Structure formats: C-alpha cells, structure tokens
Amino acid sequence: MGRGYRLVLVTDRRGSAYSGLLGDLETYRISAAGISGRGLTARISAVFQLGLGWLQARRLLKQLRPRAVAGFGGYPSVPTVVAASQLHCNTIIHEQNAVLGRANRMLAPYAARIATSFDRTDMLRDRDQARAVHTGNPVRPEIIEAATPYRMPEGDDPIEILVTGGSQGAAIFNEIIPPALASLPDALRGRLRVTQQCRGDGLALVQAVYREAGIQAELAPFFSDIPARLARAHLVIGRSGASTVAELAAMGRPAIMIPYPHATDNHQRENAARLCDAGGGWLIPQEDATSEALSALIRSVLESPDKAGRAAECARRVGVTDAAERLADLVCELIGDNAHMKQEQPKEITA
C-alpha cells in the first residue's frame, strides 16, 4: 500500500476471520484444506477442496489481473499460487521457518522467487536454491519502535524475566519454570521480576509457587504489550516459533528456547538452532527441560552478565529489522518496478 499498489488478500474461511487484523484490506475467500496427517476420506475431501479452490482462484485472477501473487505458506496459498503460475503471473512464496513448510514445498516449483527468513532453509531442493532470496521474516512495527540497546542489570537492580509460550502459554512451562526460578540462590531470586504468559487453568498454582518463593510475578494468558515487555526483558524463556525468533533477533534479546516438540517437521527446533548457533541464545529440547537443568542454565546466564550481553549482541546481529522492505523490494524487482514508482493500476495479491 505504501508504494501505491492495491493489495488484495486471498484466503480460506479460517483465514478470512483474521482479515480485519490487516486493516481495511480487500479480501476474497476460496476453498482449501490441508492434506497431511489425515485419514483417507479426509484427504480425498481435501484434494477436492484444493481443486475447487484452484478453479475459484483462476476465475478471480482473470478478473483482477494482478502483477504479482505472493504466497505465505499454508494450504490456502496453494490454489492461488498454482493458478497464478499457470496464468503466467509473477509469483513469489515466503517461508517463515528454517524448514520449508509442506505447502511451500508443493509451491516451490511454481515460484519465480522463494523468500526465506533464515540464511539456510532445510528441505529447499537444490534445483530451487537459485531462486531463493534471504529477506528475513517481517516483524511488527511495534517491535522495531520498542527496541533499545541491551543492558544487563548491575548490583542489586531488578532482573526482568519474560516467559512466553505461544498464544495461550505452554502448560509444561507452568510445571518447570516456577520451580526452576524458585530454586535459584537467594541473591538472584530476590531480584527477579517475572512476567509469564500462563494458561488460565494453571494461573493460581503458578502464582502460589512464585509467592512462596518471594518472587514478584505478573501472570496472564495474554499480554497486549509484548513489544514493551520484550524491550525490558533481560532474559526471555519461550518457544521458538518463526515470529518469536524473528522478534528476539530484531530486538536483540538473549533467550532460552524450548521448542515445541510436535511442530511439523520439527521446525521450531531448527528455528531455535539457527539463532543459538549464531550465539543468540540457548536451546533445551523439551525432553531435557527439567526444572533442575533449566535452573542451572538460568543461574549461569544471570551470574555472568557478559554471557547474556554477548548473546544479546549475537541475536541482534542476525536480526533483520527491514524484512518487510526487503520483501517489498523483491516483489517490485520481480515485476520490473525497480524505481518503486507509485501506480494505480498494478496490483499485488497476497495468497
């Protein structure tokens, strides 16, 4: 929109429920369904839905005549990107994770460009590597605006710990993190200020553990001001979804990551590994994440300010704060608009 293009969102029924989060965006709905991990009858139905979506997408694309179509993963993007390629429209796909998702693996042969969030993406075939461009994963503007230089607290200053676990918190975090923090030495424990995303059904028990340990803690299923809390954090403990890793790197905050073990193709572990291999944090597989192991790691980080500071700097170095601009540039380059001239007629579609 900022470059003068008309943007259109093409998604399925589930995605259309979130279209309002993208502002006043023209939205079209097509049929789509996932295939993987389903029974035979469900797979047959999914293939039918994808075929119907392809017909709907072809009809829509002929009507809109877009200059470019961009797919952001998930099965709803499959019919539109395939139809666009067959209609000789410029196509691009973007992969958020360090492992190419199943939908994007299907779409890679149809894409003129493959935008990646990491400098290395697993399951990207050799023949597709030449079309891959590292753009990074766009983060919310609020993250960039809230970013401040990292400073580890000194003396008796409070230590801010931010615990996140996905949209509703991770149940296992309620079990292992409070006792891990409670078992820290008195000198550290008394300085802790914990903010923890905590499922409502376990909130009272978690609060009781913190209260008994004398730890100041703010608990809630959801925090609307995560960018500000992330900026204040001296250490983050959380999962390693694509957005979480991108925001940690863009903000430059050290993190202990416990990947969700059931993520498709174990992509959360690979996301965390990319950041940790660069020195930006520490990875603990969930099967190894006992309270004792976690407490020992937290203590080693908090008692060695230089260690946390180095991790913050390493995270910041791999962070891509202009990923949205890079992605927009890639689309403009693809359609031949190198000067990013504002025009009324050309259109981009986000599938």
Model-based region annotation:
Residues 87, 231-233, 249-258, 278:
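Conserved donor-binding/catalytic loop of nucleotide-activated donor transferases
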Residues 1, 10, 14-17, 22-25, ...:
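Donor-nucleotide binding loops and adjacent catalytic segments primarily
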Residues 307-321:
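A short, well-ordered alpha-helix in the C-terminal region of glycosyltransferases
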Residues 320-351:
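C-terminal alpha-helical cap of glycosyltransferases
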Residues 39-68:
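An amphipathic, basic-hydrophobic alpha-helix
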Residues 6, 14-16, 85-148:
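Active-site-proximal region of nucleotide-activated glycan assembly enzymes
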Residues 66-68, 231-246, 253-254:
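Acidic donor-binding loop of glycosyltransferase active sites
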Residues 14-18, 66-87:
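An aromatic- and histidine-rich active-site surface loop
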